[in-house]
């Protein structure tokens, strides 16, 4: 069963996840893309523990297998909503093994620690995961040419 901890506790894994982000999202993080995986991960590992913040999943040997982040803004069509669960990634060999669910649960705990009552997520691919984990779809939008489904979840302490 994976262990989930804040990225700020193991910032040495930023380089590993930067490579994964560049391979998973080449239009954004790859050559010619607008994003910088290393800069985003550096921000997610901030030692103060405020937004943006990321959590990582480690396997039993302590190797990184997944990441998810909580940040202030995500897609430009929904700037009125905040904060956002973003940058969800699980290595291919660990997908469908509940790692994503553990990462989402840890993000909810981080949101609660930071005093948030609701968080949001935009996704094109993780719809079934979010639905299984109790998220509710509230909208849809096209972002960077891709249809995104907008979900929300009440932070448990705020229920």
Question: How should each PLM-predicted stretch be described?
Answer:
Residues 2-17:
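A short beta-loop-alpha structural element at the N-terminal edge
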Residues 16, 122-124, 140-159:
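C-terminal "cap" of GNAT-fold acetyltransferases
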Residues 26-56:
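Active-site rim helix/loop that mediates acceptor-substrate recognition in acyltransferases
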Residues 52, 80, 85, 146:
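Short coil/loop residues immediately preceding or within conserved phosphate-binding loops
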Residues 54-56, 63-73, 84, 89:
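Conserved beta-strand in the GNAT
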Residues 87-90, 96-109:
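Conserved acetyl-CoA-binding loop-helix of GNAT-fold acetyltransferases
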Residues 111-124:
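Conserved GNAT acetyl-CoA-binding A-motif
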Residues 131-141:
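Conserved acetyl-CoA-binding loop of GNAT-fold acetyltransferases
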């Amino acid at each position: 069963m994976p262990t989930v901890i804040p990225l700020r506790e193991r910032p040495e894994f930023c380089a590993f996840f930067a490579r994964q982000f560049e391979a998973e999202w080449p239009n954004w993080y790859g050559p010619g893309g607008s994003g910088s995986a290393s800069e985003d991960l550096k921000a997610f590992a901030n030692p103060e523990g405020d937004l943006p913040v990321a959590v990582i999943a480690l396997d039993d040997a302590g190797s990184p297998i997944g990441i998810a982040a909580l940040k202030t803004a995500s897609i430009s069509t929904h700037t009125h909503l905040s904060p956002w669960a973003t940058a969800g990634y699980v290595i291919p060999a660990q997908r469908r093994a509940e790692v994503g669910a553990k990462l989402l649960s840890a993000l909810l705990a981080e949101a609660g620690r930071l005093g948030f009552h609701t968080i949001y997520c935009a996704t094109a691919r993780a719809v079934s995961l979010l639905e299984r984990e109790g998220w509710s779809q509230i909208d849809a939008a096209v972002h960077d040419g891709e249809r995104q489904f907008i979900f929300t979840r009440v932070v448990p302490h705020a229920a």
